[in-house]
Structure formats: structure tokens, C-alpha cells
Amino acid sequence: MSTQTLIYCVGAAKAGTSWLFDYLYNHPETYFPTVKELNYWNSVALGAGEFYRGELARRKGEIAARHAVTRDEDIHAYQLQSMADIEEWLVTFDGKTRDDKAYLGFIGAGLRDAKLVGDFSPGYALLGPEWFAEMAKSHENVKFLYLLREPVDRLWSHFRMNAGGDEAAATSMVDGYLSGGEENVARRSNYRRTVKRLMQAVPQDRLHVELYERLFTEEALEKMCDFLGIEVIPADFGKRVHGSPEAGLDPARRARLQSALKPQYNFIERYMGAVPVEWQERMVAA
């Protein structure tokens, strides 16, 4: 068998990572635990382990509640596996003690039948280059993936998710961001910083950057699978995975967000040679 690849998808949040994880989870040449967003490296690096352990415990409770009323046998089985995987991960990693061997074992590194294993944790986008370098050394064949979405759309989707469908609350978060608040979401919107840090630590041929707006196409999927070293299988491009509740963003706020995010547009223009046409189509006159 060819050398197994370990893929780290470092985000961005609300840029298609859940859809891609679902596609790869169901791929016959891969192995992934059901737990997306293990947050191992940022727990060790940033001391955020207790928060993420709490999030996983909460997620397990939500799955248990759905499991109690589920009648579909396939969904029932997946829910059982999800709860078991969460419990195993909470036992494997205490949220603070670095144990790369145990972590790699949990994600399937070394499994004979898996050409691809990995970890999809958008929180890794906040890490420094020294930690990307550590991740790159964790396995003999490590690659990195970073998905980018039109900056205002990504930010708005993130606020809608945080607001749980409350459009007024999401709009208030936008206003807070424009006033210099919402620091966590702001940091996750900094494509320039994350790409630069990745480029400091990761060889160019080990990094694949793709646009959310192009992800759901045969062409993008073929490039992705070629990079990952697996065959392309049919995809459900219409499947919605963890999408944010629908809500509109008024043109005035969109224009102000575009202005606030201008450094990101400028960087991507330099990095990709032009602002993607899909992004230009979403922009409004300031």
C-alpha cells in the first residue's frame, strides 16, 4: 500500500469543512472517527482543552437526546458510534497533556486499510507557525488544507450560527464587530495571518487552499482528491451539513464589513493573483 496521508483541515470555520468531512468520512479509502473538531493541537498550544471537553460533553448530550427519538436504523447506529467516539476521545486526551501517540492512534494513523486519515479542526487556524511545524512532523506524510469563503459571507454565517437563528442577535454581533468587538470571530476571519503562518511552516506542495464557492464542483473535488491521494467518488453537492439558519444581511452593513475586511481581500488578490470572481459577484458598492 502507498504511504498513508494525514490531512489537517485548519478551517476556515463556516467554509464547507463539515460537508467535506462528511464526504471523506464516507469514502472507502479513508478512516475518520465520527468526532469532527478534536482540537488536540490548539488545546495543547493555547490551553483551551477544558472548553473543548465541555463542548464535546454538550454535543454528546445533544446526540443522546436525538438518539432517544430516532427510528432510522442507520442514523441510530451512527449516533451510537458518535457517542462512543466522544467518550473514547475524552478518555484518550485529558485536554492538556500532550500525547501524540495516543492522538494519532485515535485518528487511525497507521491503519493498513486507510490511505487517508486526519483531523478537521477549524480552530487550528489560530495556531502559530511553530505549531504548524509540530503538526507537520507528527506523521511521515502530512498535508494541510485550508478552505476560504467570501469574507463577509463567512463572517455573517459565523454570527448567524452563534446567534442560533436569531437575526436581530446576529445583526447586533455584526455591529459589535464593526465597533472592535467579537474578537474570537474576528481572529477566525484573518485569512492573511493563517496562510502566512502556514507558508512559514509547510512546503508549498503540502498545502492546498480551496474556495468554498468552488468546493461543490467535480473539478474542485478532483483536485482535492488528487492532492489527498484518493480516488474521486460521487458527491452529494446539495447536501447541507451544519448550515447556519437563513437570514439576510442589509447592503449597508455588508459594505461596512467589506471595508473592515479589506486587508483580507487585498491579501487574497496577491496570493491568488486576483480577487476570485465568485467573491466579486457578492460585493456591493461602498
Predicted regions and their residues:
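The conserved 3'-phosphoadenosine-5'-phosphosulfate
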Residues: 35-39, 43, 149-152, 172-176, ...
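Acidic-and-aromatic substrate-binding clefts and catalytic sites of carbohydrate-active enzymes
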Residues: 93-97, 123-128, 185-186, 213-218
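Generic structural signal for well-ordered alpha-helices
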Residues: 100-104, 132, 195-196, 265
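Conserved phosphate-donor/acceptor-positioning beta-strand/loop module used by diverse small-molecule
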Residues: 138-159, 213
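PAPS-dependent sulfotransferase catalytic core
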Residues: 1-102, 106-111, 120-121, 174, ...
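Generic structural signal for small/hydrophobic residues in well-ordered secondary structure
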Residues: 16-17, 103, 118, 135, ...
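Surface-exposed cleft-lining segments at the edges of enzyme active sites
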Residues: 87-92, 119-124, 173-186, 240-255
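Short catalytic/ligand-binding loop motif for oxyanion handling, primarily in non-cytosolic enzymes
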Residues: 18-22, 32, 40-42, 49-50, ...
